[in-house]
Regions:
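Redox cofactor-anchoring modules in respiratory/redox and cofactor-processing assemblies
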Residues: 1-184
Length: 184
């Protein structure tokens, strides 16, 4: 966004108001693609939910969390599979390793996401990611493990075609892009 920084808004403020009115919108000629809400283990919310009022229940319904209150805005040049991998790497690194679902689940999801972003994914990887995500969510002992899969689940939910494109194009290598991702 053009105006980065720390802002506090009342519950019920829409994502559109935060990104465009307060944040000043997306720089250049790029378009809004998604907002990752709630910190590293939050979910990615697509443009179709820009008029989403920000409150605990509504945010949860679309696959995100309030979490730390962090908001990262992504433009249309951002690979959502790369984003899921980036946040999973963080969550896997932060896992204390005490419980098996988080320790193994985050590692396996990271390995699969890495393989997909390198153009080595398989069709069954999407279902495996969903299964690992649900087990990690339901069986982990702490909040990190219970929310670590949110970026994976939300990007599969809203950007499945990006996963399928990378899996179907074996010669494509998705590399982290220099995009307009800004924390607000």
């Amino acid at each position: 966004v053009k105006n980065t920084g720390l802002v506090e808004v009342p519950m019920g403020t829409t994502l559109r108001e935060i990104v465009f009115d307060i944040g000043g919108g997306i720089p250049g000629r790029k378009k809004f693609k998604a907002a990752q809400m709630g910190g590293p283990s939050g979910g990615c919310v697509p443009a179709q939910h820009l008029d989403l009022p920000i409150d605990y229940e509504t945010v949860k319904e679309v696959g995100a969390i309030m979490g730390s209150g962090g908001l990262i805005v992504m433009d249309d040049s951002t690979s959502m599979v790369d984003i899921a991998r980036y946040f999973m790497e963080f969550c896997q690194d932060e896992s204390c390793g005490k419980c098996v679902p988080c320790r193994i689940g985050t590692k396996r999801m990271l390995d699969i996401l890495t393989r997909i972003t390198k153009g080595q994914g398989k069709k069954e990887d999407i279902d495996l990611l969903k299964e690992l995500a649900e087990v990690t969510k339901s069986a982990s002992l702490c909040g990190l493990g219970q929310t670590a899969a949110n970026p994976v689940l939300s990007t599969i939910r809203y950007y499945l075609s990006e996963y399928e494109e990378l899996i179907n194009k074996k010669d494509t290598q998705s590399l982290p892009q220099e995009s307009q991702t800004t924390q607000t």
